[in-house]
Swiss-Prot record:
Belongs to the class-II aminoacyl-tRNA synthetase family. ProS type 2 subfamily. It comes from the Bacteria. It comes from Rhizorhabdus wittichii (strain DSM 6014 / CCUG 31198 / JCM 15750 / NBRC 105917 / EY 4224 / RW1) (Sphingomonas wittichii). This is Proline--tRNA ligase. PROSITE patterns: AA_TRNA_LIGASE_II (PS50862). It catalyses: tRNA(Pro) + L-proline + ATP = L-prolyl-tRNA(Pro) + AMP + diphosphate. NCBIfam families: PRK12325.1 (NF008979), proS_fam_II (TIGR00409).
């Protein structure tokens, strides 16, 4: 994509009301614009990153055996009355009436709807186990939306729901998602720590939050320093015993949110205990028959008797992840995108758009990068070199290639790695090979 044809409204200064780094940089980099309190339009650059994050989430859900569907944002209030949560949920749930005076709501979560769908369509134990998921926009009427996409009122979520015949099967589904989440966040360049967590309004007996450490995080967290060492995640999720042993081994190291602190385990950790702040990017729950029983869901068991399925739910904040990645990966100049989620792989800078030789060389290099399948943002604008460098550093693409008169005299281009600042002069062919890696 040529920057001269792109829609990239970058800002030199941060708006006064932007409080945290990710909010400031997303606005400055032309990724989002606020349209109402806690509601944002996703501009082209931000939308590209959002789609890449979403695709990684989707691939790891599929890999874990989950099946994708899509549920609507609007839900009937009657479903929530069945579960008993309609009156209990609170003012965060936006309630409306349609023209026929039927009570509706913007879904803040989907336990009721997925339970109704499964209840009305699953008949036998042969329909279990199943994990169903969707990626959909949600709305929660936060009393004080803040921090940009980190705590907005409208946000993109991945929600998965498991249905199992017994507790053992439900725990296996839970463990599948536990590992899938660790793999998901690692692919995005994040180190997420699974922490024992409060179940909140979702309910249930077992819950983990996945926390990315950041000074701006809203959660106070406590963990063993062993969590600072990257763990191998090459376990067979279909092997029930091996997977349970793997999860037990991981969670043997203490990690908990403030609500679930364990003084005895903290004392045992001794000097290895750390206290920090973190950002919640995922939350998983096992809640047994809380919703299936309340909504009358049964299937015929192997012995012909009705069985109430065991359930779990598994959420990832897809849009929130973008803010978390920026909080974890930035410097004074701007964003530093991990390769897997960067909007483009390389930023190509023509230092002299008014120089016919530079323009021809940059155009040729752009064509070669595109032919090699390398996503490229080509700054072909007639701007000062300093402004072009500042824009590229701000938007944080993993690589920068600079084409200028001095380099052309030597038959080289300058290649810069954004994360390290390392610069090397290479031939065009070698630069492309280095990026393609």
């Amino acid at each position: 994509m040529r920057l001269s044809r792109h829609f990239l409204p970058v800002m030199k200064e941060s708006p006064a009301d932007a409080q945290i780094v990710s909010h400031k940089l997303m606005l400055r980099a032309g990724m989002i614009r606020q349209t109402a309190a806690g509601i944002y339009a996703w501009l082209p650059l931000g939308h590209r990153v959002l789609r890449k994050i979403e695709q990684i989430v989707r691939e790891e859900q599929d890999r874990a055996g989950a099946i994708e569907l899509l549920m609507p944002t609007m839900q009937s209030a009657d479903l929530w009355r069945e579960s008993g949560r309609y009156d209990a949920y609170g003012p965060e749930m936006l309630r409306i009436k349609d023209r026929h005076d039927r009570e509706m709501l913007f879904g803040p979560t989907n336990e009721e709807m997925i339970t109704a769908i499964f209840r009305d369509n699953a008949r036998s134990y042969r329909d279990l186990p199943r994990i169903l998921y969707h990626i959909q926009w949600k709305f929660r009427d936060e009393v004080r939306p803040r921090f940009g996409v980190m705590r907005g009122r409208e946000f993109l979520m991945k929600d998965a729901y498991s249905f199992d015949l017994d507790i053992e099967g439900a725990r296996h589904s839970y463990n599948r998602m536990f590992v899938a989440y660790l793999r998901t966040f690692r692919r995005m360049g994040l180190s997420a720590i699974p922490m024992q967590a409060d179940t909140g309004p979702i309910g249930g007996d077992l819950s983990h939050e996945f926390i990315v450490l950041a000074p701006t995080g809203e959660s106070e967290v406590f963990y063993h320093t062993n969590w600072e060492v990257e763990r191998a995640l090459d376990v067979d999720v279909d092997d029930v015993a091996a997977l349970q042993g793997f999860v037990d081994g991981l969670t043997a190291d203490y990690a908990a949110t403030d609500e679930k602190r364990d003084p005895a385990r903290e004392a045992a950790a001794g000097d290895s205990l750390k206290q920090s702040r973190g950002i919640e990017v995922g939350h998983i729950f096992y809640f047994g028959t809380k919703y299936s029983a309340a909504m009358g869901m049964t299937v015929q068991g192997p012995d012909g008797q009705p069985v109430t399925p065991q359930m779990g739910s598994y959420g990832i904040g897809v849009s929130r992840l973008m803010g978390a990645i920026i909080e974890a990966s930035h410097d004074d100049a701007g964003i530093v995108w991990p390769d897997a989620v960067a909007p483009y792989t390389v930023g190509l800078i023509n230092m002299r758009a008014d120089d016919a030789r530079c323009a021809a060389a940059a155009d040729d290099l752009y064509a070669k990068l595109e032919a090699a399948g390398i996503e490229t943002l080509y700054d072909d604008r007639d701007e000062r070199g300093g402004a072009k460098f500042a824009t590229m550093d701000l938007i944080g693409l993993p690589w920068q290639i600079v084409v200028g008169p001095k380099g052309l005299d030597k038959g080289v281009v300058e290649l810069k790695r954004r994360a390290t600042g390392e610069k090397v002069e290479l031939s065009v062919e070698d630069a492309i090979a280095r990026i393609a890696g």
